Structure formats: C-alpha cells, structure tokens
Amino acid sequence: EAPANAVAANDPTAVALKYNADATKSDRLAAARPGLPPAEQHCANCQFHLDDVAGATEEWHGCSLFPGKLINVDGWCASWTLKAG
C-alpha cells in the first residue's frame, strides 16, 4: 500500500513527467531514454532517486523531482536518467 505522502497519479508534476508507480505500465519505449534498455529503467536506478528521506521504506523512496513526496522504487517517469556509477 502506498504511503500517505506518495506521489499521486494526478499530481501535476507526475502528469507532466508521465510518472507511474509501476514502470511496467509506463511507456518507457516511446520515451527513448538512453542508458539502459527501457525494460530495465526504473526509479531505483535513476540519478534523481533518493534513498535517505523521511518516511522512506523498502518500496518507497524519495526523488529530487518530487520534494517531500515518495516514489515507488519500481516506478518510472520521462525524466529517468541512469544513475552514475
């Protein structure tokens, strides 16, 4: 179950970035983001992903694009960029 401060599907930023808490339900192929094949792109391997934020759980972490909110580590958005390292 999503925490209270999870990014909502109707959040304006989420809509603009085509965020989906389940990457398999997003159109990763159409976005053509470089770095990894679309099927391997998800929030946990994105440079904007933040591990250490208030309220984070194993499944829900922070994202610098959604301050104060949590994203699903298995999610995806159109700003996905491969994490360095």
Curated annotation (Swiss-Prot):
[4Fe-4S] cluster binds at C43, C46, C63, C77. GO terms for molecular function: 4 iron, 4 sulfur cluster binding; electron transfer activity; metal ion binding. Transmembrane segments: none annotated. Keywords: 4Fe-4S, Electron transport, Iron, Iron-sulfur, Metal-binding, Transport. The keyword Iron-sulfur applies. One of its GO terms (biological process) is aerobic electron transport chain. Belongs to the high-potential iron-sulfur protein (HiPIP) family. Homodimer. Specific class of high-redox-potential 4Fe-4S ferredoxins. Functions in anaerobic electron transport in most purple and in some other photosynthetic bacteria and in at least one genus (Paracoccus) of halophilic, denitrifying bacteria. This is High-potential iron-sulfur protein. It comes from Thiocapsa roseopersicina. The lineage of its organism: Bacteria, Pseudomonadati, Pseudomonadota, Gammaproteobacteria, Chromatiales. The gene is hip.
